[in-house]
């Protein structure tokens, strides 16, 4: 068995693939052994004596199946989680959505005349300070404090 390492290295460089992907025709080993220049290797590639194996990829089938399950809300339990909760749900975005909802609710209440401008300003500042956890919490507070008036 002749040593074809040099030919394999040249062929890999010409084909722009790794050496493991270069395939020699087993019937033409003597012909390949005689090829010592890059031009000789190019001719053998054109003849089909030397060729590049197709690259193997990783199958995405299982990953697609898992993504489909997660779309339904499955496979999201505590055992599947890595990192802190803020890594899964951005805390800033969480805050933004909550404060926007609370401010929208306050605007609607003010425009409907359910709360005065002064009460609106007081509640707005409280919401900005993180006093309320949610719109429901805000409405509960309003019913308790301002519902009496």
Swiss-Prot record:
Pfam families associated with the record: Ribosomal_L19e (PF01280), Ribosomal_L19e_C (PF25476)
Domain of life the protein comes from: Archaea
This protein's UniProt keywords: Ribonucleoprotein, Ribosomal protein, RNA-binding, rRNA-binding
Keyword GTP-binding on entry: no
One GO biological process term: translation
Region (Disordered): 46-99
GO molecular function: large ribosomal subunit rRNA binding; structural constituent of ribosome
Annotated Gene Ontology cellular component terms: cytosolic large ribosomal subunit
InterPro entries reported in the protein's UniProt record: 60S_ribosomal_eL19_sf, Ribosomal_eL19, Ribosomal_eL19_arc, Ribosomal_eL19_dom, Ribosomal_eL19_dom1, Ribosomal_eL19_dom2, Ribosomal_eL19_dom3
Basic and acidic residues composition bias: residue spans: 89-99
Compositionally skewed regions (Basic residues) per UniProt: 59-85
Function noted in UniProt: Binds to the 23S rRNA.
PANTHER family in the cross-refs: 60S RIBOSOMAL PROTEIN L19
Complex and partners: Part of the 50S ribosomal subunit.
Family: Belongs to the eukaryotic ribosomal protein eL19 family.
Protein name, per record: Large ribosomal subunit protein eL19
